[in-house]
Amino acid sequence: MNVNQGTVGSDPVILATAGYDHTVRFWQAHSGICTRTVQHQDSQVNSLEVTPDRSMIAAAGYQHIRMYDLNSNNPNPVINYDGVSKNITSVGFHEDGRWMYTGGEDCMARIWDLRSRNLQCQRIFQVNAPINCVCLHPNQAELIVGDQSGVIHIWDLKTDHNEQLIPEPDVSVNSVHIDPDASYMAAVNSSGNCYVWNLAGGMGDEVTQLIPKTKIPAHKRYSLRCKFSPDSTLLATCSADQTCKIWRTSNFSLMTELSIKSNNPGETSRGWMWDCAFSGDSQYIVTASSDNLARLWCVETGEIKREYSGHQKAVVCLAFNDSVLG
């Protein structure tokens, strides 16, 4: 990504943010200009994800997922998925766009067939606590589910078998992620800790084996999100402590701390860092925070390159896709 250069015509960079003001905003990443605002009337937006073909964006909220068209200015959702009783906290897609997965506070992870005209979910994985996060293994065959009781579930979609991990009993798992190389899995929780495992197996019919690698005392307050960089060399953790920290995966040492803390002693907290996403070249990261802003940072220097201002309430999720399809 080049932060100083735009493109003529269709922008290959998709940057969308959403949160508690019931809007999804689309931005020109390099300039900070808001190019489109979609009213998401029903509820706050908890999670955003762009479809693999970059044609639509999914917004997960209370009891529903709304799909908006990225290639037109149609203000209305083009597809609605309903029938979930509580908040949907996580949404994502199979790499070929065949199905969508969600997790929610109704204690269920779901698989939705996107090729079917029937907008019902096809498979359900029930756990014993509200689900905060779901991520798909790069092998496209296992879903990792984190819940509020502190359990991480590995759901094998081929066999329906599942394994459980409990890094800290009764401490809510808020985010899980696997790096693109499928070398590591990270999870962060409400005590601020980040757990990292080495991955083995997971190819063919083999179930992924998780070997504990390290525990990072990443934050002193809730840790809300963890994301590996596309080149698998970095891990970002976001927290209620107003920081996003970037760790090197070579030794899990701290490389950069991105902070929205005020230098003014009289100013109260600017709020939580809720979400983050790396650029395709792993050199930049976008963060979403409850001071109503998203920011673009240089990973190496920690310098803020752009601020995206326009939301009226907390920004809690974002989608950032600057990969150009071949």
From Swiss-Prot:
Which InterPro entries does the UniProt record give? MLST8, Quinoprotein_ADH-like_sf, WD40/YVTN_repeat-like_dom_sf, WD40_repeat_CS, WD40_rpt
For this UniProt entry, what is the primary localization, expressed as one broad class? Answer: membrane
Q: Give the domain of life.
A: Eukaryota
Where in the chain are disulfide-linked cysteines found? none
Pfam families from the UniProt entry: WD40
Compartmental location: Lysosome membrane; Cytoplasm
Keyword annotations of the record: Cytoplasm, Lysosome, Membrane, Repeat, WD repeat
The family annotation for this protein states:
Belongs to the WD repeat LST8 family.
| Binding partners and assembly | Part of the mechanistic target of rapamycin complex 1 (mTORC1) which contains MTOR, MLST8 and RPTOR. Component of the mechanistic target of rapamycin complex 2 (mTORC2), consisting in two heterotretramers composed of MTOR, MLST8, RICTOR and MAPKAP1/SIN1.
Q: Can you name this protein? A: Target of rapamycin complex subunit lst8
Q: Name the species this protein comes from.
A: Danio rerio (Zebrafish)
